[in-house]
Amino acid sequence: MSKKYDAGVKEYRDTYWTPDYVPLDTDLLACFKVTGQEGVPREEVAAAVAAESSTGTWSTVWSELLTDLEFYKGRCYRIEDVPGDKESFYAFIAYPLDLFEEGSITNVLTSLVGNVFGFKALRHLRLEDIRFPMAFIKTCGGPPNGIVVERDRLNKYGRPLLGCTIKPKLGLSGKNYGRVVYECLRGGLDLTKDDENINSQPFQRWRERFEFVAEAVKLAQQETGEVKGHYLNCTATTPEEMYERAEFAKELDMPIIMHDYITGGFTANTGLANWCRKNGMLLHIHRAMHAVIDRHPKHGIHFRVLAKCLRLSGGDQLHTGTVVGKLEGDRQTTLGFIDNLRESFVPEDRNRGNFFDQDWGSMPGVFAVASGGIHVWHMPALLAIFGDDSCLQFGGGTHGHPWGSAAGAAANRVALEACVKARNAGREIEKESRDILMEAAKHSPELAIALETWKEIKFEFDTVDKLDVQ
């Protein structure tokens, strides 16, 4: 051998702690929140994360001499304190692009959040953010259609899309399920959806559901003269079954299908997104299982990372929480990952949880979906927070109306249009929310009843995962 080989164990920081390194534009950058075991220096723990998520192992190995370790290794180039947390710190790591397969989110996550999360030198580890370089983004398919194309397909402009999840989400026969879809769509909603856990159960097989839903959508379109749709969940036991369901939705001339991207997996999701792009189908994405991964403030993966990965893997709509509803998520954090779903460039902004500038180039945007514990009183705040390029989904806030789902849908439609009209007239819709809604209710008995029904319903719990800012 031309180089000397010294067997044994050496400290990670000797190789992977490089504070003088200046990241390249082509590097994939990651920010981890690290909590090491007591007595282990920060630099050693951070370097261990860089090593174990790239080229390193616990021992010096002779085969390192067969490659260019200096070229391929991950480098921890910066360490920062976490505001208000004396135990943890931020480790910023740069990875050369050649470590990752082109267009493969699966491969990126296998490296960054693989075995390193079980490393004994760590008490906790959380992936807070990723900066994907443009050279990698250009290898990803991204959203199969994007916001502009979706609006054209649905012929909906100048306001958020309005939808709901069918309830009860489990237990209905296919025919009764279709009846509920019809009631919601004829009442004024643009879209209805399968819940994340409705696939093909004994009480309702998928083909039966698809057929009755297609009939309901077409009847509602004929009655209202509007384009309607329903998110048909194609998540299945195998990829082959998933594609079979997608093909049948296409045969029924349905405009949009759905996938549970975390439980279904990024490989399946990317494949389905590619199919949708080729077949002119919109793709709605549910984030079931996300909170298992992202809710602990010191361990796991932040949802902003999962949202970025979804935009690259492919989806036209993604659930993001509501801020005001029953699900976890504060306003600034939510706005931070909504920006990364929709904008072409997102600057670093710690007040929104964004640790890096992120350039998305010409990649299409993704509709942010607000769903979970929302009702008509939330409409002004939802419009102010999410803006027009969003989908507002009221499940219980539609079906729980005393007069039924059609009346609940009508109430939500009137409330939305009243808020959009008030905003366009220059009114401060959050401050004037009560006046705006009460004025609209004078001409809508459905809205008046909805306002009375849900006037005391609030979800005022403190956020578990807060931004690390002072």
Curated annotation (Swiss-Prot):
Annotated site (Transition state stabilizer), which positions?
Answer: 326
Q: Does the keyword Oxidoreductase apply?
A: yes
GO molecular function terms here? magnesium ion binding; monooxygenase activity; ribulose-bisphosphate carboxylase activity
One biological process term in Gene Ontology: photorespiration
Q: Cite the InterPro entries for this sequence.
A: RuBisCO, RuBisCO_lsu_C, RuBisCO_lsu_C_sf, RuBisCO_lsu_fd_N, RuBisCO_lsu_N_sf, RuBisCO_lsuI
Q: What does the UniProt function comment say about this protein? A: RuBisCO catalyzes two reactions: the carboxylation of D-ribulose 1,5-bisphosphate, the primary event in carbon dioxide fixation, as well as the oxidative fragmentation of the pentose substrate in the photorespiration process. Both reactions occur simultaneously and in competition at the same active site.
The protein in question is named Ribulose bisphosphate carboxylase large chain
Source organism (scientific name):
Prochlorococcus marinus (strain MIT 9303)
Which gene is this protein's source?
cbbL
